């Protein structure tokens, strides 16, 4: 039996590669996935999955003291022809199929939501306009649940836009039929006092393609947990993300790609910029290649650009492999300040120092913004980046 190896990933804040038949991402979790909140003890901050999160800023989402109010959030779905939009109760059989909660807040959300939004794209339907889901906080506490399901060979783009002020815990499910193609853009543009904790579960069918773009700007605390599993061979997943963490903000993205099926691919790329005292970004990237997942091809990357003193980044990529019969697997993580050579080059071409710094940050994010593919959303995010830069560069 292979002995586990811990190999530091160059230039990472933290990270390792573990190669072992008995060492999996699941073994590091304090409890297995469950829909029952009672299966998860109240966290105290010493647990591996909670050690980076300031529990006192969760407003009671983690210990059962956050009680839902009737005016927590308002959800509005705009969908083109050919899409079915339903509001369903807790007992609907279509809920919970993409995966179970993996922590207490997600389980609390699952046990506390009253109604769920279910968006269904019919088999072989190809949408020419995006589905837009607006989640607007109205100042209260809310628990939410959404399901987006594509039939076989359907194609769709979904934009989920979070705005306003709320204390929200929510689960989102993406279910892709065989050969389906789904792009999801999830934007967290909350007011500065908002708290948002979410788990996103994607179940990718045979030969299906899933692309997720997570964008996080606002909020006092945002903690997101995107997860991907495969329902058949040939599936592909791309997980992209960008975040801009300001003074005293806590933004945490914890990813898991579970390669549980042969001949699937995944590509993870997240980038963040930080500025101001107390700005804290956390990125955890877990990729598990199970013994049955021969022919896997995977890569994950996290890059962080620190714009001012007083900001902190914790970046932890983890790659765990249970079979040697793979196409490729790797990871990278780096955190740094402005590239002096880039700045010198731009200034030598007559570009003022302030504008040179702006160009570097724009270029840093450009490749991920372009992954969105929706001009109006891309323009809005570029405007947000410019507004953030006004405060620092």
Language-model segments: residues:
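Residue-level "edge-of-site" marker
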Residues: 50, 359-360
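N-terminal amphipathic, basic helical "cap/leader" segment at the start of enzyme domains
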Residues: 2-115, 126-127, 131, 270, ...
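Generic hydrophobic-segment detector
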Residues: 28-31, 39-41, 299-300, 340, ...
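Conserved beta-strand/loop scaffold segments within soluble protein domains that form the structured core
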Residues: 6, 96-351, 361, 365, ...
């Amino acid at each position: 039996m292979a002995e586990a190896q811990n190999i530091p990933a160059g230039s990472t804040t933290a990270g390792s590669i573990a190669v072992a038949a008995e060492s999996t991402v699941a073994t590091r979790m304090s409890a297995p996935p469950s829909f029952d909140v009672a299966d998860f003890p109240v966290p105290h901050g010493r647990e591996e999955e909670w050690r980076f999160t300031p529990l006192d800023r969760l407003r009671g989402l983690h210990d059962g003291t956050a009680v839902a109010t009737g005016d927590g959030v308002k959800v509005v779905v705009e969908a083109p022809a050919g899409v079915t939009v339903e509001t369903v109760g807790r007992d609907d059989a279509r809920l919970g199929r993409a995966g179970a909660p993996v922590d207490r807040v997600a389980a609390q959300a699952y046990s506390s939501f009253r109604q769920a939004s279910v968006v269904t794209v019919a088999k072989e339907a190809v949408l020419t306009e995006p589905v837009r889901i607006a989640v607007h906080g109205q100042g209260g506490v809310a628990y939410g649940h959404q399901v987006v399901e594509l039939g076989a060979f359907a194609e769709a783009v979904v934009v989920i836009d979070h705005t306003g002020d709320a204390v929200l815990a929510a689960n989102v499910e993406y279910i892709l039929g065989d050969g389906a193609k789904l792009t999801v853009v999830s934007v967290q543009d909350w007011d500065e006092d908002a708290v948002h904790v979410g788990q996103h579960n994607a179940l990718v069918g045979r030969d299906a393609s899933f692309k997720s773009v997570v964008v996080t700007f606002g909020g006092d605390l945002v903690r997101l947990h995107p997860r991907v599993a495969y329902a058949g061979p040939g599936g592909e997943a791309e997980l992209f993300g960008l975040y801009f963490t300001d003074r005293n903000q806590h933004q945490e993205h914890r990813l898991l790609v579970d390669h549980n099926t042969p001949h699937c691919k995944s590509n993870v790329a997240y980038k963040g910029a930080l500025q101001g005292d107390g700005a804290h970004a956390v990125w955890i990237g877990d990729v598990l290649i199970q013994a049955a997942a021969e022919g896997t091809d995977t890569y994950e990357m996290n890059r962080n650009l620190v714009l001012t003193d007083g900001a902190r980044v914790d970046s932890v990529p983890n790659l765990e492999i249970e079979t040697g019969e793979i196409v490729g697997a790797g990871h990278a993580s780096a955190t740094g300040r402005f590239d002096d050579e880039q700045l010198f080059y731009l200034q030598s071409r007559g570009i003022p120092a302030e504008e040179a710094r702006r160009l570097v940050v724009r270029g840093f994010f450009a490749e991920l913004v372009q992954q969105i593919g929706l001009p109006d959303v891309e323009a809005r995010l570029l405007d947000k980046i410019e507004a953030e830069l006004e405060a620092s560069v």
